[in-house]
Amino acid sequence: MRILLFSICILLQQFATAQSSNEPLIRVDKITIARDTYGVPHIFAPTDPEVAYGLAWAHAEDDFTTIQTLILTGKGKLATYLGAKGAPVDYVFGLLNTKATVLAQINSLDPKLILLVKGYLAGLEAFAKAHPEKVLNKNVFPITIEDYLATTVFSVAVFCGVDRTLPKILNGSIAHLKGMTGEGSNTIAVHSSKSTSGENMLVINAHQPIEGATAFYEAHLQSEEGWNILGGLFPGGPLIFHGTTPNLAWAHTVNLQDKIDIYQLETDKAHKGQYKVDGEWLALEKRKIKINIKGIPFPISKMAYSSIYGPTAKTPEGKYFSMRLPALMDAGALQQWYAMNRATNFTEFKTAVAQNHLAMFNIMYADKRDTIFYISSGKMPYRNADTSYHWNSTLPGDTRATLWTKFKPLNEFPQYTNPKSGYLINMNHSPFLATAESENLDPKNFDPKDGYELYHNNRSRRAKDLIDPLEKISYADLKRIKFDRQLPSTILFPYGFTADTMFLIDENKYPTLSPLIKALKNWDHNTNPESNGALIYNLAYYEIPKLMEGRKDDKLTTQEAIATYQYIYDFLMKNYNRLDVSLGEMQRLVRGDESWPQGGMPDVLAAVQTQPYGAGQRKMNSGDAYIEFVR
């Protein structure tokens, strides 16, 4: 009895110490990590922070290197591991200054989230201590919660397009204002009224890289505090980003609203280090970023700038451009995801979504109580209605009229609940084409400055073609639709250049290229691995953007189409010495030393994106990275 009482006293003392220091109580002996036959970890523990500790340990067992690279990113120390290749990332991290956002907001975050994250970080620290030989370098640990949260803010900003916008500024290709001289996903929700079984169903289908920092990792998390969820997360994630609980499920897809505004500052030589706003010259804030690069004994310094609009970069011509994006203003993304993880019904889930901490993402939802729901969410600002400002291009950075400060609430986003059609879809296409035509929202009722997509892509068009004829949808139908490899009868070109000229070339005029032209014209639009037509189209898909660089929103010319056929001819003869090559011979799924024929293409429902591999082949590097069917 005395031993028991003594043990209880010690336990209570540990608990009190943990709580008084705002640290979670972690009892390693209470944490269970059980892996199924696929290696997926199922983690059980009394508390949420202890589950997060177990998740960190399990994920570190599988991919500790990737997790550590993210930690180094959050410290601006990636170059200490990657060398010069990591230096640009360290500079951008310093430029965006996400840690300042975290420091300003961390005290307003839910204390339960803070404990959860601390539990996760404790798991990583413990794994590192148990396996010191796996630690990349001395800069990885220890890691503070501020470092960690700064990484999450940075990651969301990258998802919002910083990685595409900033290089255009730094290399001088950003659009200049006249007069101022101074890598998709699918999701389908089916209502019980539309399903043959009378169940709600949801397809979660993320198109992400199959390796690296944004490759999905599956886990099942369950605590005695009510957290119970199976789904996917990225390396370094302390919770599920999308998945299913016993009561509800949701999926994310990337939406393409206007998430970043670019401002050209007004400067001149007479006011060095200043920029002009509303007739007033303001000081351009400067910070020196020190970058430590592996192999170089001293740090390299590079200047970062900031204006009232946001992080600012200097072009090679000496012009200054500022970026303003909501993703850099909110450190609460994990808090919203945590609330979504813990929701038990639609009311709680929608309350979580209404926090509006996520700067982007479509959210598709289904539950066991007959509700399906879709919203194209984001952190969208109220922008000036003056039509002289072109929000999808470069804005004048000489007036506060373009400086937005307030954000729209949930009810101003496109959303659907239980449409009569019985289904909702999103394939990174327009939120105004989400269900039956008669029930689709009218884009005229929403702010055009938000930049919502207004088009179908090939995946959404094909999904509609497969769903609309069905009076009811079975579970087998849902899987058949998801794994479909067919392009629609009329191929769409929604992302810029139009390439249907490839199908209009007269093969009789080009005898050498004639077999390729005929094969493409006779192609049934199926991208199975046995198809020769799919191979030709696939090679054209990756070659045409190179020919049309700088001519987006234009049409492929006849001369360019012929040049594309010539490229395909030369490629096949060089690498295979024949033209009747199948897609699967060239396109491969490679894991370790194994290589298999791979069907699919970037804009089919069973999406596959590839990169050059060896001599004359391409291997899958992105696409159907995570699939979950829920009913």
Regions from the PLM with identified roles:
Residues 113-203, 208-210, 368-372, 379-382, ...:
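Acidic, low-complexity N-terminal propeptides/linkers enriched in Ser/Thr/Asp/Gly that mediate export
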Residues 358-469:
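Hydrophobic alpha-helical segments
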